[in-house]
């Protein structure tokens, strides 16, 4: 920008950097679509000229005649198949039909045939249901057998999948088994006899200086020994070991082993109690004579 002492107009002219319309830009013809319009008009004119001369009508007649012939051939083939089906099936023939309710194939017998409508009435074997079917939709009797085999295979596969899922769930939840063992152990603890009374309790007044030197009672058995089933007992602790189950045939090896271990435990319990009682009596006599 010139900083001179002249008039203001020369300063404004010197400060202008760009003026529209004064120069020729390289991209001035970007929006010029004159050539495109001319090409479109030329194509439309040539199409109209060909249409007037009849060149396009001949080409258009050829594809029109082709689809008319194909449906005619298809209809003939369909009629041949339907006629063959009508000749094949007779009243009383065994067949297989698709029941409209569930879409499955069932064995059936043809009760009547309508040759005009090309339909028939079938009676499903073993069910007695009647249904109208197209003759062309009837299947051979072996189709029902094959369908039943596939259904049975699918049902067996579903059952095996369910049993596999149940076994996996039982393996993943061991807490339920431990809870069952604990509940059985708790119920059996109420049936165990009480610990033997100390010397002097129920046997007359206790004498000074006497001590019970007999073997202590055995500890309670582990919970897994108490998991076997035994019949219920009346209220109160039993004096003798409980009898074995009434129906031993219904028990497995684990239950039989549990019953045997319980019997051993109870036998040792009462044996220790008896030995302690005898030793207490013997020591009491010795101290009495001394």
Curated annotation (Swiss-Prot):
Q: Which GO terms describe its molecular function?
A: RNA binding
Question: Region labeled Required for interaction with RPP20/POP7 — which residues?
Answer: 94-207
Q: Which InterPro entries does its entry note?
A: Smn1, SMN_C, SMN_G2-BD, SMN_Tudor, Tudor, Tudor_SMN_eumet
Spell out the residue ranges making up region: P2 (binding site for SM B).
Answer: 237-264
Please indicate which superkingdom the organism of origin belongs to: Eukaryota
UniProt biased composition (Basic residues): 65-79
Location of region: Disordered = 1-29, 54-85, 151-219
- Please list the residue ranges that the record marks as compositionally biased, kind Low complexity: 151-161
All copies of the Tudor domain together span 88-148
Under the subunit heading, UniProt states: Homooligomer; may form higher order homooligomers in the dimer to octamer range. Part of the core SMN complex that contains SMN1, GEMIN2/SIP1, DDX20/GEMIN3, GEMIN4, GEMIN5, GEMIN6, GEMIN7, GEMIN8 and STRAP/UNRIP. Part of the SMN-Sm complex that contains SMN1, GEMIN2/SIP1, DDX20/GEMIN3, GEMIN4, GEMIN5, GEMIN6, GEMIN7, GEMIN8, STRAP/UNRIP and the Sm proteins SNRPB, SNRPD1, SNRPD2, SNRPD3, SNRPE, SNRPF and SNRPG. Component of an import snRNP complex composed of KPNB1, RNUT1, SMN1 and ZNF259.
Name of the protein in question: Survival of motor neuron protein
Q: Which organism is it from?
A: Felis catus (Cat)
Specify the taxonomic lineage.
Answer: Eukaryota, Metazoa, Chordata, Craniata, Vertebrata
């Amino acid at each position: 920008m010139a900083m001179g002492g002249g008039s203001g107009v020369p300063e404004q002219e010197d400060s202008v950097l760009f003026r529209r319309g004064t120069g020729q830009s390289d991209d001035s013809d970007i929006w010029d679509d004159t050539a495109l319009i001319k090409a479109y008009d030329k194509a439309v004119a040539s199409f109209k000229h060909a249409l007037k001369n009849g060149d396009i009508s001949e080409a258009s007649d050829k594809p029109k005649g082709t689809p008319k012939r194909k449906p005619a051939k298809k209809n003939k083939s369909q009629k041949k198949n339907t006629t063959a089906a009508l000749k094949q099936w007779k009243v009383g023939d065994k067949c297989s039909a698709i029941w409209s309710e569930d879409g499955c194939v069932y064995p059936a017998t043809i009760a009547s045939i309508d040759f005009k409508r090309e339909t028939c009435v079938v009676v499903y074997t073993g069910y007695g249901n009647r249904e109208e079917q197209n003759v062309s939709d009837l299947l051979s009797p072996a189709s029902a057998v094959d369908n039943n085999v596939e259904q049975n295979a699918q049902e067996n596969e579903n059952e095996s999948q369910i049993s596999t899922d149940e076994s996996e769930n039982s393996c993943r939840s061991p807490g339920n088994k431990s809870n069952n063992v604990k509940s059985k152990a708790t119920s059996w603890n109420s049936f165990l006899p009480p610990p033997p009374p100390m010397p002097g309790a129920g046997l007359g007044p206790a004498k000074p200086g006497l001590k019970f030197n007999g073997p202590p009672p055995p500890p309670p058995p582990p919970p897994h020994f108490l998991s076997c089933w035994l019949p219920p007992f009346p209220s109160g602790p039993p004096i003798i070991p409980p009898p074995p189950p009434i129906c031993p045939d219904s028990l497995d090896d684990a239950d039989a082993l549990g019953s045997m271990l319980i019997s051993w435990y109870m036998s040792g319990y009462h044996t220790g109690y008896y030995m302690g009682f005898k030793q207490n009596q013997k020591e009491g006599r010795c101290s009495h004579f001394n």
